[in-house]
Amino acid sequence: IKTGMLATVAIIERVADELAAHSTGVPLVVDPVMISKSGYELLDPDAVATLRTRLLPQATVITPNLHEAGHLLKSTVRTEADMRDAARALHDMGPEAVLVKGGHLAATDDAVDILFDGTTFHAVRAPRIDTPHTHGTGCTYASAIAAHLAHGRPLPEAVQHAKAYVTGAIDAALAIGSGHGPTNHFFHCTPFTESVAASADAA
């Protein structure tokens, strides 16, 4: 099971109640979507508090980015050392594991994420890809983790597979329109033989 943006206290409470009643033993990936790419806060403070107390403790793993981790902790996460501290503090809120995503780290050659299971830290690295077309990367990453957990893979292995998948999807991202284009979820299935722009011109 994977959750994404849950906008209100009522929605979070209903999801938490249903999960508690029906999902015993099923891995739960919580992607705590709460801040837009432009920095706009999508959840009010009461909803964030409910997310902390009702949903995080049920999670197999939570997958905040730097901004979301900072928002949950009411702090700032800027460095890899900060990510490790944040992962430990978030783990204290009850999830089995925490994956702090470092895609927004400044001036790094690789994209590093920190996975913490309460005992061991794992640094999950991939080459940083210079592209503006990263719309949906966090959702894709969390969903891929959930898919690999559903296949029975241990969490560290599931995260490694998901990281490789989302990196490939970013590398093959689609330049659609004039804004941030989406990742290409099907890059490994049906390679495009011509550019999206050329296809659009032909149409």
Positions of predicted regions on the chain:
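Short, small-residue alpha-helix embedded
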Residues: 71, 132-155
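Nucleotide and nucleotide-moiety/phosphate-recognizing core
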Residues: 10, 14-21, 27, 112-115, ...
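Short beta-strands and strand-loop turn motifs
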Residues: 2-3, 29-37, 63-72, 100, ...
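Glycine/small-residue-rich loop that forms an oxyanion/phosphate-binding "nest" at active or ligand-binding sites
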Residues: 2-57
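Conserved phosphate/ATP/ADP-binding segment of small-molecule kinases
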Residues: 45-121
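Charged C-terminal helix
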Residues: 156-203
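Short, charged, surface-exposed loops that flank catalytic or proteolytic processing sites
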Residues: 75-83, 150-160
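Short pre-catalytic strand/loop immediately N-terminal to key active-site residues, enriched for Gly-Thr
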Residues: 121-135
